[in-house]
C-alpha cells in the first residue's frame, strides 16, 4: 500500500461570508482534481431554501399592477428572488407578508413560521403610497441548484398562484488556484487555494463540509466495487499520531499519587488508552477512588490533550479546588499532600 503524507486544511476568514481554504500538500495533479470537483459541487449541489411561488391579494397574474404600489408585480417578483431564507422543514412551508402604506416594504415585514429564517431583512420588496396595501403569501421549499418558474408551476394550482424562479444554492462564488509546494526535497506537490463566498444562510466552512460529504458518498460507489483494491492511503495526521502515542503510554508515566495509581492498577487499567475509555462514573465505582482522584486524573489527561470518555471539552484545571495551575502542584488544603503519600497507605494494604 502506497502511503501519502496527510494534507492539512486551513481556513482564512476574509469577510463575514467569505473564506479562503488552503489544502496542502497534495500529490502532483490532485490539486486540480480536487479543486474542480469541490468547485462544481459547491456551486450546484449544496442544499438550500428558496421561494417557489407567491400569491398576491387581488392579483391574478404577474403582468399587472397593485393599486397603491409603485412597483408592478414583475418587479416585486424580481425583488423576491433575492430573498435569502433557510428552512429546517423538508415539506413546503408558507410565509405571509402584510403591510399598509405609506412606506417601504422589506423582507423584515415577512412573518416566517417556526423553522424558517429570513437572513436579509433589509432587502427592498416594494414601496407603498398612502392608500397602498400589500398582502403576499409565499411558499418556501428546500432544494438544490436552480429551478425555473415553469418547473415550479404545479398542475391544478389555484388561480392567482404565481410560480417564480428558485435559486436554492446558498453559494455565490467559488474560485480556486493551484500552486507548487515543497515536501522535503520535492517541489512538485500541489497546494490548492479555494476561495468560497456564500449567502448569509450558510458559512463557507459549512458549505465546504457539505460538498466534501457529497463527494465522499459518490466516490464511495466506486470503492464498493472492490473494497480490497489497492490505492494511495493517506497517512495519519500529526495530531492522530500523537494521540496514538499517548494512548500507548503506561499509567506509570502520568505520575499519579499512590492511591490513584494502585486503584487503577487493581481495576486492570494499565495504559492511558484504557483510562480514557472510562467515564467518571466508572472510576467512582472503584473502591477508594473518590472525587479528588478523579480531579487528579482529569488534570493529568488534560496535560496530554486528552480527557475521560464523558468529560466536557471545556474542562479547566484552574477551576479545580486546591490545584495551582502555575506550579502544577496541589495546595495543602486540597485534601491530600502529594509529598506525603501516607493518605494512600490503606490502598497498599488492600
UniProtKB/Swiss-Prot annotation:
Q: Does the keyword Ion transport apply?
A: no
Q: Where is this region: Disordered?
A: 328-350
Q: Which Gene3D superfamilies match?
A: 5' to 3' exonuclease, C-terminal subdomain (1.10.150.20), DNA-directed RNA polymerase, insert domain (2.170.120.12), RNA polymerase, RBP11-like subunit (3.30.1360.10)
Tell me which EC number(s) this protein carries.
2.7.7.6
State one molecular function term (GO).
DNA binding
Q: Which SMART domains match?
A: RPOLD (SM00662)
- SUPFAM superfamilies in the record, alphabetically? C-terminal domain of RNA polymerase alpha subunit, Insert subdomain of RNA polymerase alpha subunit, RBP11-like subunits of RNA polymerase
Q: Kind of enzyme, top EC level?
A: transferase
Alphabetically list the UniProt keywords: DNA-directed RNA polymerase, Nucleotidyltransferase, Transcription, Transferase
- Positions with biased composition (Acidic residues): 336-350
- Positions of the region Alpha C-terminal domain (alpha-CTD)? 241-350
What Gene Ontology terms describe where this protein resides (cellular component)? cytoplasm; DNA-directed RNA polymerase complex
Which family, according to UniProt?
Answer: Belongs to the RNA polymerase alpha chain family.
The record comments on the domains as follows: The N-terminal domain is essential for RNAP assembly and basal transcription, whereas the C-terminal domain is involved in interaction with transcriptional regulators and with upstream promoter elements.
SUBUNIT field: Homodimer. The RNAP catalytic core consists of 2 alpha, 1 beta, 1 beta' and 1 omega subunit. When a sigma factor is associated with the core the holoenzyme is formed, which can initiate transcription.
Q: What is this protein called?
A: DNA-directed RNA polymerase subunit alpha
Q: Which organism is it from?
A: Mycolicibacterium vanbaalenii (strain DSM 7251 / JCM 13017 / BCRC 16820 / KCTC 9966 / NRRL B-24157 / PYR-1)
Lineage, top ranks: Bacteria, Bacillati, Actinomycetota, Actinomycetes, Mycobacteriales
Name of the gene this protein is made from = rpoA
Amino acid at each position: 500500500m502506497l502511503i501519502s503524507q496527510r494534507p492539512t486544511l486551513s481556513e482564512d476568514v476574509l469577510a463575514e461570508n467569505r473564506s479562503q481554504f488552503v489544502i496542502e500538500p497534495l500529490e502532483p495533479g490532485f490539486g486540480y482534481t480536487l479543486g474542480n470537483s469541490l468547485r462544481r459541487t459547491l456551486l450546484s449541489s449544496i442544499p438550500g431554501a428558496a421561494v417557489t411561488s407567491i400569491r398576491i391579494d387581488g392579483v391574478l397574474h404577474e403582468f399587472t399592477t397593485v393599486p397603491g404600489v409603485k412597483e408592478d408585480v414583475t418587479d416585486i417578483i424580481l425583488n423576491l428572488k433575492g430573498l435569502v431564507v433557510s428552512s429546517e422543514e423538508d415539506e413546503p412551508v408558507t410565509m405571509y407578508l402584510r403591510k399598509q402604506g405609506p412606506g417601504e416594504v422589506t423582507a423584515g415585514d415577512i412573518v416566517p413560521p417556526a423553522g424558517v429564517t429570513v437572513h436579509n431583512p433589509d432587502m427592498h420588496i416594494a414601496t407603498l403610497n398612502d392608500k397602498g396595501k400589500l398582502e403576499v403569501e409565499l411558499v418556501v421549499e428546500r432544494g438544490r441548484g436552480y429551478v425555473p418558474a415553469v418547473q415550479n408551476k404545479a398542475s391544478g394550482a389555484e388561480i392567482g398562484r404565481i410560480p417564480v424562479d428558485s435559486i436554492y444554492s446558498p453559494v455565490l462564488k467559488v474560485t480556486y488556484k493551484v500552486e507548487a509546494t515543497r515536501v522535503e526535497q520535492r517541489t512538485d506537490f500541489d497546494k490548492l487555494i479555494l476561495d468560497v463566498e456564500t449567502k448569509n444562510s450558510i458559512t463557507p466552512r459549512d458549505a465546504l463540509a457539505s460538498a466534501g460529504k457529497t463527494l465522499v458518498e459518490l466516490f464511495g460507489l466506486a470503492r464498493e466495487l472492490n473494497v480490497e483494491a489497492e490505492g494511495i492511503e493517506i497517512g495519519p495526521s500529526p495530531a492522530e499520531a500523537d494521540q496514538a502515542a499517548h494512548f500507548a503510554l503506561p499509567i506509570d508515566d502520568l505520575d499519579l499519587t499512590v492511591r490513584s495509581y494502585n486503584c487503577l492498577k487493581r481495576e486492570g487499567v494499565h495504559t492511558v488508552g484504557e483510562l480514557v475509555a472510562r467515564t467518571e462514573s466508572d472510576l467512582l465505582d472503584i473502591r477508594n477512588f473518590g472525587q479528588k482522584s478523579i480531579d487528579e486524573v482529569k488534570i493529568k489527561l488534560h496535560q496530554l490533550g486528552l480527557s475521560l470518555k464523558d468529560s466536557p471539552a471545556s474542562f479547566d484545571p484552574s477551576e479545580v479546588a486546591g490545584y495551582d495551575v502555575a506550579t502544577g502542584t496541589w495546595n495543602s488544603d486540597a485534601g491530600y499532600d502529594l509529598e506525603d503519600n501516607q493518605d494512600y497507605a490503606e490502598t497498599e494494604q488492600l
